[in-house]
A protein has these predicted regions:
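A structural signal for small-residue-enriched, beta-sheet-centric alpha/beta enzyme cores
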Residues: 1-230
Length: 230
C-alpha cells in the first residue's frame, strides 16, 4: 500500500493529544467512514494544511471525455508556493476552471509582468510543505502507462502553484486505474488525452482546495483574505 503524509505540526494549535496511536485511529476512522460525502476545504488531510500565506485544504475535480474516459483528482494542498497571482485574487488555475468552481472570476489583467520575486510565508524552515494528490482513471492501464499518467498529472501542480516542487516541498501524485475501459488501437493518443485530463483535474483540485478552505487560527481562508467586494 503506497502512502504519504502531509506535515502540519508547525502550524499552531495544541498538538499534545496527537499521540502516535492516534494516527492509526485516524486512518481507521477515515476508512470506516468512506462514502459519497464531498466536503472540501478544512476536512481530512486538509484540516491543518496551509498554502503559501493562505489556509490550504482538500480539493477535488473530475472530467469525462466524449469517449467515456473519466478522470478524478483529489488534492491535499499544503504548498510552500502560492496558488494566486501576485497582487491579484485570481488563481493561477483560472483558465481551467469549470462552472465557477473556484469563484468564476474573469481573466486576470495584470498591468505589469508577473514579478520574479517571491514573498515567502516565512520563516524558512526545514522542508515541511507538500501537495499530495490522488488521481483515478477508469482506463485499463499497464504499470508503465500509469506511471506516464502520473508524470503528466504533475503538470497540474505546476499550473496551479508558483513556485512548485521547491526544496521545501515533497509534492507527490498517486495514480490508480480501475480498468473499466480499454484503450483503443490508438493507444498513445488515448494516453495523451487521458494525461492531459489528469493535469487539468489536478490543477483545478488544487485551486478548489484553497478556495473552499476556511480561516483557521492565524491562517486566513481565501474568501476571508479576498472578500467579494475587494
Amino acid at each position: 500500500m503506497s502512502a504519504a503524509v502531509l506535515f502540519d505540526l508547525n502550524n499552531g494549535g495544541d498538538k499534545t493529544l496527537l499521540k502516535p496511536h492516534r494516527y492509526y485511529e485516524f486512518g481507521y476512522e477515515a476508512a470506516s467512514s468512506a462514502g459519497l460525502d464531498r466536503r472540501l476545504g478544512n476536512v481530512g488531510a486538509g484540516i491543518g494544511a496551509k498554502s503559501g500565506k493562505l489556509k490550504g485544504g482538500l480539493g477535488s475535480a473530475s472530467l469525462e471525455d466524449d469517449f467515456g474516459m473519466t478522470v478524478g483528482a483529489l488534492a491535499a494542498v499544503n504548498s510552500f508556493g502560492m496558488v494566486t497571482i501576485p497582487g491579484h485574487r485570481e488563481f493561477w488555475a483560472w483558465p481551467f476552471e469549470r462552472n465557477g468552481e473556484f469563484g468564476g472570476l474573469p481573466p486576470p489583467c495584470p498591468e505589469d509582468p508577473i514579478p520574479l520575486d517571491y514573498d515567502p510565508p516565512g520563516p524558512f524552515e526545514e522542508p515541511t510543505n507538500t501537495t499530495l494528490c490522488v488521481v483515478a482513471v477508469n482506463a485499463l492501464l499497464t504499470r508503465p502507462q500509469a506511471l506516464r499518467m502520473a508524470i503528466m498529472a504533475h503538470d497540474g501542480l505546476a499550473r496551479a502553484i508558483r513556485p512548485v516542487h521547491t526544496p521545501f516541498d515533497g509534492d507527490m501524485v498517486f495514480l490508480l486505474a480501475t480498468g473499466e475501459k480499454a484503450l483503443s488501437e490508438n493507444t498513445n493518443l488515448d494516453l495523451t488525452r487521458i494525461g492531459m485530463m489528469t493535469a487539468d483535474c489536478v490543477c483545478r483540485s488544487v485551486a478548489r482546495g484553497v478556495y473552499e478552505a476556511q480561516s483557521l487560527g492565524r491562517w486566513s481562508g481565501y474568501r476571508s483574505h479576498f472578500p467579494p467586494n475587494c
